[in-house]
From Swiss-Prot:
Protein name from the UniProt record: 2-isopropylmalate synthase
Superkingdom of origin organism: Bacteria
Cofactor(s) listed: Mn(2+)
Catalyzed reaction equations: 3-methyl-2-oxobutanoate + acetyl-CoA + H2O = (2S)-2-isopropylmalate + CoA + H(+)
Places the protein is found: Cytoplasm
Family indicated by similarity: Belongs to the alpha-IPM synthase/homocitrate synthase family. LeuA type 1 subfamily.
Assembly information from the UniProt record: Homodimer.
Function field: Catalyzes the condensation of the acetyl group of acetyl-CoA with 3-methyl-2-oxobutanoate (2-ketoisovalerate) to form 3-carboxy-3-hydroxy-4-methylpentanoate (2-isopropylmalate).
GO BP terms, alphabetized: L-leucine biosynthetic process
Name of encoding gene: leuA
Domain Pyruvate carboxyltransferase, first and last residues per copy: 4-266
CDD domains (alphabetical): DRE_TIM_IPMS (cd07940)
Length: 506
């Protein structure tokens, strides 16, 4: 039975989703969770895109120990050398170089002939191979490329030293039958086919990304590319968790086994959703809130008698816990630390003390602490530690009619304290106006969403906001038991990002 490897591009293709703007610390959190998930290759970003991207890719490359770290690059020497500088410190570095091969891209975007494209592929892969132990080449818009030219381009790339060949459905144009046929065609038409691993990369514009990825596996692909929760530009990418579970459940059909730690799927999905602010639909396969719910009386009766009557996936397979109580206010530091290790978190002594203090404060207010609470606590504390500004005091009081007044005290990284007050037509508006006054921002609240992390009256609140000033748009989140505190934390998180970004581009 063949093993299917996974290349995750949540940190590159996924971050291109409109409204998603991850900072370096958030990208590192996701990278560490992808490592726990057992992802074989993670595309950490596009190192040549900006200094910020370069630094994020470099930090991830220098941190991750058990996965290949890859940077995207155009078929340009400057991009390739920049990618090398970013990932050379990785345990297993890889270059991902791409060039379009379809007629429409060659004519209108590249303004290059077929001969020029083939020459560029050869030169860029050759350079990459002189720097990197492994090189992946992607024929952008492969599914709209003439098959004979695609086979020629792939052969040139392999002869130049490419170890992995990606056949992307860049605009989500193909269907499963066509995609399967394309992989079979390349198997028969590329003389050096056996010298490389073939990979698929599907977009979901026509809603077939996962189906196309599975068809590619049938056709011979040994690597599947995609993102967690299927996020990405336009309609998104293939959801890796769906492909992996489909391969596992239907291994009898696909004769393949996913190389992924499936029990980490739920935790990974939740982390990506909360950091990006992209809510997972309740009815989404594998990780949606209703994925294992049954409301029909007939279904409920069947499941109670024999679970396999209506459930083909055991919730525990993907790490879907029953959200049972795990810790409380009487739990000690050792029990807390051991539980966090079990969930995949490691701390320095200082980090452990800070997180344990936050846990004790939560436990004093909340009777039962669940695994979801602990993950949310870690998420909130990580964001808190990485912020330029943090809230030290928040007070809201009624003025008149529907007017509220908020007093906010912030402290920056250097210990400077800032205080201001403002009014608004509600508590949230008053708080946000006060924060704007302190930070000197005039921005628009483009989105505000609140979710309950767990059930019950004492549940933690997760607030996501998006702020917009001119062409700049950023997101932030806050976690707290009090909705107003969570809302304030989210706004400060986003506003700090926005202020830094504006200062950077000035």
């Amino acid at each position: 039975m063949k093993k299917i490897l996974f290349m995750d591009t949540t940190l590159r293709d996924g971050e291109q989703s409109p409204g998603v703007n991850l900072n370096e610390q958030e990208k590192l959190q996701i990278a560490r969770q992808l490592e726990r998930l057992g992802i074989h290759v993670m595309e950490a970003g596009f190192a040549a895109a900006s200094e910020g991207d370069f630094q994020s890719v470099k930090r991830i490359a220098n941190t991750i120990q058990n996965a290949t770290v890859m940077s995207l690059a155009r078929a340009k020497e400057s991009d390739i050398r920049r990618a090398y500088e970013a990932v050379k410190g990785a345990v297993s570095p890889r270059l991902h170089v791409f060039l379009a091969t379809s007629d429409i891209h060659m004519k209108y975007k590249l303004c290059m002939s077929k001969e020029d494209v083939l020459d560029s592929i050869y030169r860029s892969v050759t350079l990459g191979k002189s720097l990197f132990p492994t090189v992946q080449f992607s024929a952008e818009d492969a599914t709209r490329t003439s098959r004979d030219f695609l086979a020629e381009a792939v052969e040139v790339a392999i002869r130049a030293g490419a170890n992995v060949i990606n056949i992307p459905d860049t605009v989500g144009y193909t269907n499963p039958e066509e995609y399967y046929s394309l992989f079979k065609y390349l198997q028969e038409s590329v003389p050096s086919y056996e010298k490389a691993i073939f990979s698929c990369h599907c977009h979901d514009d026509l809603g077939m990304a996962v189906a196309n990825s599975l068809a590619a596996v049938e056709g011979g692909a040994l690597q599947v590319e995609g993102t967690i929760n299927g996020i990405g530009e336009r309609a998104g990418n293939a959801a890796l968790e769906e492909v992996a579970v489909a391969l596992h459940i239907r291994k009898d059909f696909y004769k393949a086994e996913p190389s992924m730690t499936l029990k980490e799927i739920k935790a990974t999905s939740t982390l990506v959703s909360r950091l990006t602010g992209m809510v997972v639909p309740k009815n989404k396969a594998i990780v949606g809130a209703n994925a294992f719910a049954h409301e029909s009386g007939i279904h409920q009766d069947g499941v109670l008698k024999e679970v396999t009557t209506y459930e083909i996936i055991e919730p525990a397979l993907v790490g879907e816990s029953q959200n049972l109580f795990v810790l409380g206010k009487h739990s000690g530091r050792h029990a807390f630390t051991e539980k966090m290790k079990e969930l995949g978190y490691e701390f320095t002594n200082d980090e452990r003390d800070a997180v344990f203090e936050a846990f004790k404060k939560l436990a004093d207010r909340k009777k039962e602490i669940t695994e979801e609470d602990l993950r949310a606590l870690m998420l909130g504390e990580a964001a808190f530690a990485a912020q330029q500004y943090n809230i030290t005091q928040l007070q809201v009081h009624f003025v008149s009619n529907s007017t509220q007044c908020a007093t906010v005290v912030l402290k920056d990284e250097e210990g400077n304290v800032f205080e201001d007050a403002a009014t608004g037509s509600g508590s949230i508006e008053a708080i946000y106006n006060a924060i704007q006054r302190i930070l000197g921002l005039e921005c628009e609240l483009a989105d505000y969403r609140i979710q309950s992390i767990t059930q019950g009256q004492d549940a933690l609140a997760h607030v996501h906001v998006e702020l917009k000033e001119g062409a700049h748009q950023v997101s932030g989140f806050g976690v707290a038991q009090d909705v107003l505190e969570a809302s304030a934390r989210a706004y400060v998180h986003a506003a700090g990002k926005l202020k830094s970004f504006i200062q950077l581009v000035k």
